[in-house]
Amino acid sequence: MAQFFKPQKKSTQPQRIEFTVDSLDHHCVGIGRHQGKAIFIEGALPGEQVKARILDDKKQYAHAALQQVVTPAANRIAPFCNHYRECGGCNAQHLGEADQQAAKEAGLVSLFERLGQIKAPVLEPVLTGESRAYRRVCRLAIKFDKNGRCTRVGFRRRQSNDLVEIEGCPVLAEPLSALIAPLRECLNRLKSQRELGHAELIQAEQGIMMLLRHTGRPNEADRALLVAFAKSQGIDLYLQAADERIEPLHQVFQPSYSLDGLSLAFAPGDFIQVNGPINQSMVAQALAWLGASKDDKVLDLFCGIGNFTLPLARQAREVVGVEGDLAMVARAEENARRNGIDNARFYKADLSGDIVGMSWAREGFDLVLLDPARPGALEVMGHVVKLSPKRVVYVSCNPVTLARDSQVLVKGGYRLVRLGMLDMFPHTGHLESMALFEQ
């Protein structure tokens, strides 16, 4: 009788390995090698012998979960947060702040030289601030537990979509951290618990603003409970529906923040930097590097609500701000009016598309500043080169796209003159940086 070949089923057991960590990447993630393959592992430090479980096995590399540190590094420290082992909010509390910054700086230089093929200059001093209670913005995950029949509030678990319930967070501004427990208590009293999405907390100068995602239509009883909660906590509360519409449920103040003597108003859903003091330092450094005078016309791309535009307008002859979100363009215009600035103009434009035919794009500019989101600004870089400004300052929250986009400037005749890191997000793998290019 013929025998048919039956391939053996692949084992579903996760592979467990032991190896030595050699270095850290710019996310403060450990890198080692096992059987010739690069292994990325959070929570491990250079020099450590570790035991790990493979999570995601690719041809050239793999991601692994730390199970045991066999030989700890001398610079390993105890995390200051009780939730650190589980919570995915921070990933570098086991490393001192100076070592975190050094790893990120080394990663920044490596990305420029390896990915961008650009020789990095000696880095500028890191812009630093407080490393705890620094976040003025956070997004809390909310999940209804069917088994416990209760609503849980916290952050996503490390390397998972599960939720870690927390009582407080030491990197949040203290008023935001103190709001978590009473918020959980309030949400557990709602009839519409299953329809809750997430809650965004923002610390404005006037107080706390909360944007609560609600995918249904809360009844009058739930609305009354939420309003009572907002009043008792002294916060403003907005609801965001599934179609993204935002409804003020309890509004007392117009949120704003101060910047270099200016007052910048914002609204729920607007982007603002999470670290207020570092934002102040960042804007001051960008203005100093750009060096605008009363003879200069400046272009500010991805301008948001005017975070760089309005301080620049006090130095330059004229500033043009361009932003893809129409609501933030309107907010930037209002911020110019409320601060008595009449030499700033704002336009809405999709900066990932073709901008050649736009009126502002045909104007001449002496200086350019850009501060794009994580995807970077590749589509607009060629046009920046064509404008031929004297200097370009690029502020970035993603060093990978910064290094990539910088190639366009260098090939267009610009030199990378200054490069530095801003410690906007201590204890995390996020890296903010700034680069200056000159013709």
Swiss-Prot record:
<feature type="binding site">
    <location>
        <position position="87"/>
    </location>
    <ligand>
        <name>[4Fe-4S] cluster</name>
    </ligand>
</feature>
<dbReference type="InterPro" id="IPR001566">
    <property type="entry name" value="23S_rRNA_MeTrfase_RlmD"/>
</dbReference>
<comment type="similarity">
    <text>Belongs to the class I-like SAM-binding methyltransferase superfamily. RNA M5U methyltransferase family. RlmD subfamily.</text>
</comment>
<dbReference type="GO" id="GO:0070475">
    <property type="term" value="P:rRNA base methylation"/>
</dbReference>
<protein>
    <recommendedName>
        <fullName>23S rRNA (uracil(1939)-C(5))-methyltransferase RlmD</fullName>
        <ecNumber>2.1.1.190</ecNumber>
    </recommendedName>
</protein>
<feature type="binding site">
    <location>
        <position position="302"/>
    </location>
    <ligand>
        <name>S-adenosyl-L-methionine</name>
    </ligand>
</feature>
<dbReference type="InterPro" id="IPR029063">
    <property type="entry name" value="SAM-dependent_MTases_sf"/>
</dbReference>
<feature type="binding site">
    <location>
        <position position="307"/>
    </location>
    <ligand>
        <name>S-adenosyl-L-methionine</name>
    </ligand>
</feature>
<feature type="binding site">
    <location>
        <position position="81"/>
    </location>
    <ligand>
        <name>[4Fe-4S] cluster</name>
    </ligand>
</feature>
<keyword id="KW-0479">Metal-binding</keyword>
<keyword id="KW-0411">Iron-sulfur</keyword>
<feature type="binding site">
    <location>
        <position position="273"/>
    </location>
    <ligand>
        <name>S-adenosyl-L-methionine</name>
    </ligand>
</feature>
<keyword id="KW-0004">4Fe-4S</keyword>
<dbReference type="GO" id="GO:0005506">
    <property type="term" value="F:iron ion binding"/>
</dbReference>
<dbReference type="InterPro" id="IPR030390">
    <property type="entry name" value="MeTrfase_TrmA_AS"/>
</dbReference>
<comment type="function">
    <text>Catalyzes the formation of 5-methyl-uridine at position 1939 (m5U1939) in 23S rRNA.</text>
</comment>
<keyword id="KW-0408">Iron</keyword>
<feature type="binding site">
    <location>
        <position position="169"/>
    </location>
    <ligand>
        <name>[4Fe-4S] cluster</name>
    </ligand>
</feature>
<dbReference type="InterPro" id="IPR010280">
    <property type="entry name" value="U5_MeTrfase_fam"/>
</dbReference>
<feature type="active site" description="Nucleophile">
    <location>
        <position position="397"/>
    </location>
</feature>
<dbReference type="Pfam" id="PF05958">
    <property type="entry name" value="tRNA_U5-meth_tr"/>
</dbReference>
<feature type="binding site">
    <location>
        <position position="90"/>
    </location>
    <ligand>
        <name>[4Fe-4S] cluster</name>
    </ligand>
</feature>
<dbReference type="InterPro" id="IPR002792">
    <property type="entry name" value="TRAM_dom"/>
</dbReference>
<feature type="binding site">
    <location>
        <position position="350"/>
    </location>
    <ligand>
        <name>S-adenosyl-L-methionine</name>
    </ligand>
</feature>
<dbReference type="InterPro" id="IPR030391">
    <property type="entry name" value="MeTrfase_TrmA_CS"/>
</dbReference>
<feature type="binding site">
    <location>
        <position position="371"/>
    </location>
    <ligand>
        <name>S-adenosyl-L-methionine</name>
    </ligand>
</feature>
<feature type="binding site">
    <location>
        <position position="323"/>
    </location>
    <ligand>
        <name>S-adenosyl-L-methionine</name>
    </ligand>
</feature>
<keyword id="KW-0949">S-adenosyl-L-methionine</keyword>
<keyword id="KW-0698">rRNA processing</keyword>
<dbReference type="GO" id="GO:0051539">
    <property type="term" value="F:4 iron, 4 sulfur cluster binding"/>
</dbReference>
<feature type="domain" description="TRAM">
    <location>
        <begin position="10"/>
        <end position="68"/>
    </location>
</feature>
<dbReference type="GO" id="GO:0070041">
    <property type="term" value="F:rRNA (uridine-C5-)-methyltransferase activity"/>
</dbReference>
<dbReference type="GO" id="GO:0003723">
    <property type="term" value="F:RNA binding"/>
</dbReference>
<keyword id="KW-0489">Methyltransferase</keyword>
<keyword id="KW-0808">Transferase</keyword>
<dbReference type="InterPro" id="IPR012340">
    <property type="entry name" value="NA-bd_OB-fold"/>
</dbReference>
<dbReference type="Pfam" id="PF01938">
    <property type="entry name" value="TRAM"/>
</dbReference>
